[in-house]
């Protein structure tokens, strides 16, 4: 990348190719975009456009085949497995479309469980209240 920006997230010519030498599937083809800190962004597109792949790359759950993925000035595209684990644990939050909760724990207990691996855990009750779940703290 040649120019400096104040982007919090920056993808520069990111590609993701799955498959073998004989069969290649290009899931993401040299995409570039920037997101400023605090900016609200929606990723939309038709099925198969690469939305999930891009989110998985940003979330550190998949790695780009090529390009740069900068988050807060750090190129996570160059992270090894251990660094990506730390990034997922300490720097990023992900809400999956099909999430898995521990069924015999309440909403509050599920969040408290996840916070046990955080360096600087937030208050579970406060977090749930902030996302509109104040009345469901004790729901299973």
What label would you give each PLM region?
Residues 4-8, 17-30:
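A short, flexible loop at the N-terminus of ABC-type nucleotide-binding domains that lies
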Residues 22-25, 76-93:
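ABC ATPase NBD coupling module
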Residues 41-42, 94:
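Short beta-strand immediately N-terminal to the Walker A/P-loop
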Residues 44-46:
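The feature captures the beta-strand-to-loop junction immediately N-terminal to the Walker
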Residues 59:
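Helix-to-loop junction immediately C-terminal to a conserved catalytic motif
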Residues 68-70, 74:
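ATP-binding/catalytic-site motifs of ATP-hydrolyzing domains
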Residues 74-75, 119-136:
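Conserved ABC ATPase "signature" region
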Residues 103-112:
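Short coil-to-helix segment of the ABC ATPase nucleotide-binding domain corresponding to the Q-loop/switch region
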């Amino acid at each position: 990348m040649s120019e400096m920006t104040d982007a919090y997230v920056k993808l520069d010519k990111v590609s993701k190719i799955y498959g073998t030498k004989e069969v290649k599937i290009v899931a993401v083809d040299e995409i570039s975009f920037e997101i400023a800190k605090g900016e609200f962004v929606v990723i939309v597109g038709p099925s198969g456009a690469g939305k999930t792949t891009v989110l998985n790359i940003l979330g550190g759950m998949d790695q780009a085949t090529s390009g740069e993925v900068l988050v807060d000035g750090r190129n996570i595209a160059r992270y090894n497995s251990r660094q990506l684990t730390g990034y997922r644990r300490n720097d990023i939050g992900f809400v999956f479309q099909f999430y898995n909760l521990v069924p015999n724990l309440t909403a509050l207990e599920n969040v408290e469980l996840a916070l046990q691996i955080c360096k600087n855990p937030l208050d579970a009750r406060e977090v749930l209240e902030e996302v509109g779940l104040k009345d469901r703290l004790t729901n299973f």
